[in-house]
A protein has these predicted regions:
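Short N-terminal "domain-start" leader segments
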Residues: 1-29, 83
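Mixed-charge, Lys/Arg-enriched low-complexity segments
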Residues: 33-84
Length: 84
């Protein structure tokens, strides 16, 4: 069950990614989902807190976009996640 968290969506080139930093029953985790390909670029990775999770998700998304088409990560608008 989700306790708290944030998420952001990126659309650049032909890519659509969702970045997550969330606290749940397993602890605080960061992840990145590729909406276009319907797979996880970075599945749940344990982090110390929500802010570190945001940083890790951004790093994974930035690396993926550079590798997949030399694309730059635009500025993000983080939104609060809904509780389950």
């Amino acid at each position: 069950m989700l306790d708290q968290g944030v998420w952001a969506e990126v659309r650049v080139g032909g890519e659509q990614l969702r970045l997550f930093s969330e606290r749940n029953a397993q602890g605080v985790q960061a992840s990145v989902y590729n909406v276009t390909a319907k797979n996880w670029i970075a599945p749940s990775e344990p982090v110390d807190d929500i802010e570190q999770g945001k940083d890790r998700a951004v790093a994974h998304a930035r690396a993926y976009l550079r590798k997949s088409g030399n694309l730059e990560l635009p500025s993000l608008e983080w939104k609060k996640s809904n509780s389950a």
